[in-house]
Curated annotation (Swiss-Prot):
It comes from the Bacteria. HAMAP family: Trp_synth_alpha. It is an enzyme of class 4 (lyase). Pathway: Amino-acid biosynthesis; L-tryptophan biosynthesis; L-tryptophan from chorismate: step 5/5. The keyword Amino-acid biosynthesis applies. SUPFAM superfamilies: Ribulose-phoshate binding barrel. The active site is at 48 (proton acceptor), 59 (proton acceptor). The keyword Amino-acid biosynthesis applies. PROSITE patterns: TRP_SYNTHASE_ALPHA. Its EC number is 4.2.1.20. This is Tryptophan synthase alpha chain. Belongs to the TrpA family.
Amino acid sequence: MNFIDERFERLKKEGKKAFIGYVTFGYPTFEETLWFIKLVYSYVDILEIGFPFSDPIADGEIIQKASIKALSEGVKLSHLFESIEKFKKDKPVVLMLYANTVYKRGIDRFFESCKACGVDGVIIPDVSFEESFEFKEVAEKFGIVYIDLVSISSLERAKMIGRQSRGFLYCVSRKGVTGFKGQIDDRIFTFLKELKTVTSTPLAVGFGIKSKEDVQKFKDLADGIVIGSAIITKIDEGKDKLEDFLKEISESLKDK
């Protein structure tokens, strides 16, 4: 059993759903990023760290701006690995980054570095399920969980992926990019119910979840909630606003 599996098992026993919080590495500045990462890590159950990329196709305006700012700070993948070594303790860390970054470092070298610094899982959003096996094979060799994404646009495809998934299955709550300000697509609720019938892998819902009210909508169906853009926004508002938000979301995920 990997560390991500262990975390979900523990949370299930505690009657709690996983709070998966996302931060962009290098944001708001290179000097401040580790401080904010540590703060978010102290409240979440699983930390997702995004490594900035110049063309982040899955990300909305908020995370795109954060990525551009982080890139202007001159962050490197080696900086990320060094930072993870400094704060990683008793909760899983997942990286989200684009395929070009992995290819640039070399697939074997990338996953070897992940293992060395304590990364538990990796999400590569611009790689399709069919193209993911070259990454999965190497990830497994180094004990890293490769996490699949599924979309409401194709339930049967999602079921196929779900049957083979590990760690948790990242369920995209609607079409589009992260941080979208529109309504959550109601089809996601039936989608989650159907997925539960074919996979025992925990289901984590993300994209556009920004409040405790949004969390409540998914609490009975999902095993975890992914929040990213809303956390970036709270970072912009300062430490106190961020910490209040993290506390509120964490409390809302407890079984009451």
